Amino acid sequence: MKILITDSLLRKTFDLVNILLKNFDEEAIIFSSDHSLNKIEKIYNTKNIYLLRNNFFDSDLKIISERYKNESIIYFPVEENTTIHFYKFLIKYGDENFKYLLPSFESFNLSRNKNDLNVFCENNEIPCPKYYSKQNIYNKKFDYPLILKPKIGSGSEGIKFIKSKSELIINKIDFKNYFIQELLDNPRDIKAGFFMCKEGQIISFYSHQRIRTFPEQGGVSVYSKSDLNHEIKLAGKDIIKKLNWSGFMMIEYLQDVSTNKFKLIEINPRLWGSILLSEFINANFISLYISLCLDQQISPNVVKSDKFIRWIFPFDIIHFFKNPENPLKFFKIKDDTCYVNFTYSNPMKSFRFIFFTYFNYKKLKQKLFNG
């Protein structure tokens, strides 16, 4: 068996590889990327690297498949765009020797388009923020406040809050790429549920609460606490069944303060940035995914609550300098906390990853040696 790692220079991929190396030999891992293969070699000290270019995806993946034709190759859905290429490969060539756990292509595309997902939820009576169509907006059939979002994207990029008539300039809204929802009273109190599924059934679950984000308003999670929120699990059960979902799924919710219902905000249909927490709390989504791909028997795990995950470099460090406090307390290493790009790694390997991915190596080299 081999394990194909795409998008090998991402921080979540680095954590994925370190988790895999707890349970598998280095020879089992195939690294791939559409660029910077030399960086991958330096970070992971490996030669088992292949080009997987967007413009030549099918032919590049064929090379990998043929190279290991006598073995099964596990595919991990690291990034959405890469996974779309993988779906198209499967449609054209069939499974070949690849093993994977994915929903239908239609369900995958629906999940990543926030506009289509919102309409789907409303049509299927799944609680979600109220959706306003372009016609609703032009006919003034809506109530303030509103939120304008990109149809496809993750995080807070492109999001705009519209709280009054003066902030709504209809003729400047790109309705092809953006859509409008009601703005709930607590737009930043997002809770996340993490699911491993097979054919519409939840195999394993955990959730987390955000403690700190960067930037503070609408930013990425840099400090979170694990829990087992059964209301979120119950809320996710319906859409997972309706989409007949298989594989990884992260669902973000906001709790409507007027009804106390959890409303679905968005779905991430691939590996998420805090996947490290899954291993740390014994949810073990990575090994579970592989077992499900291979139709192996699985045993239930006791998932731990009240554990933490921190993304120290660079964003928690930036937060510290913007909000100074006792450094010994802020940076204290704790046993109940896992650290993005450090836990399950070693200091030298983590340093190499940070150096080759966060810094421009060529420019730094020129400054050091060319004055």
Residue ranges of predicted features:
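Protein kinase-like catalytic core scaffold
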Residues: 146, 203, 261-266
